């Protein structure tokens, strides 16, 4: 038996046209998908992509394909689906590490990333460090220094959007229009990690969130920006291919109850009726 877990992401810190193609830096938070791999017949309600990952691993290490039928995958996750919280990446990455361990192997981060993108666009939550990642082909993997500590008030919307559907939206001109802002945002992410400055990270995320309004607009976005200013928060980040939004803050410094009250006053809870206060955590898949 082997058990592994991978964190969710509150959207992305940044996503857009950086260094010649669309890339992202995920925002890992303390909400996990936990996957147990054991011997046994497959569960009837298993997640298809987790099974696809096991099959991909068997292929990778040249095991006979029929072994898959003796491997049971049990995914335990309450991460919201199709809202930009990297639920699918968490499932398949945790499956990969648990299944690899079950088969007596280890996977390094670049190989894990490559296996994940072979199944679907992947979030950079698979890396321990904040990482600029080409989520379509894993060709770029640039890690940052240790990330500054902060919390996120994650605003959850009932709206859903499958990542695959987002990738069908024509967005090349919008991505190009935001390229200069995203280059600045990427530089600020690196500076924030070097100087351990959460405000700098918030500036980076806010720049990217503003650019994302051209591609997948969030409702009442100006009210969100005003709230960030009024409450002196670090910034706002968004799911660039989903509906969640994160208010970047410090639960010990900022008055979270007041912020929630402000969300109601500004009628922002109409769009985001659920809120979750979560720590930003280091990414990467951990064996349990």
Swiss-Prot record:
Superkingdom of origin organism: Bacteria
Alphabetic keyword roster: ATP-binding, Cobalamin biosynthesis, Cytoplasm, Kinase, Nucleotide-binding, Transferase
UniProt-recorded Gene Ontology molecular function terms: ATP binding; kinase activity
Cellular compartments annotated: Cytoplasm
One GO BP annotation of this record: propanediol catabolic process
Enzyme Commission number(s): 2.7.1.177
One Gene Ontology cellular component: cytoplasm
One matching Pfam family: GHMP_kinases_N
Catalytic activity: L-threonine + ATP = O-phospho-L-threonine + ADP + H(+)
Keyword Cytoplasm applies: yes
Coiled coil: none
Pathway: Cofactor biosynthesis; adenosylcobalamin biosynthesis; Polyol metabolism; 1,2-propanediol degradation
Principal location: cytoplasm
Chain residues that bind ATP: 80-90
Function: L-threonine kinase that catalyzes the conversion of L-threonine to L-threonine-O-3-phosphate. Involved in the de novo synthesis of adenosylcobalamin (coenzyme B12) and the assimilation of cobyric acid. Expression of a cosmid containing the full 21-gene pdu operon in E.coli allows E.coli to grow on 1,2-propanediol (1,2-PD) with the appearance of bacterial microcompartments (BMC) in its cytoplasm.
Cross-referenced PANTHER family: 4-DIPHOSPHOCYTIDYL-2-C-METHYL-D-ERYTHRITOL KINASE, CHLOROPLASTIC, L-THREONINE KINASE
Family: Belongs to the GHMP kinase family. PduX subfamily.
Record protein name field: L-threonine kinase
Organism: Citrobacter freundii
Gene, per the UniProt record: pduX
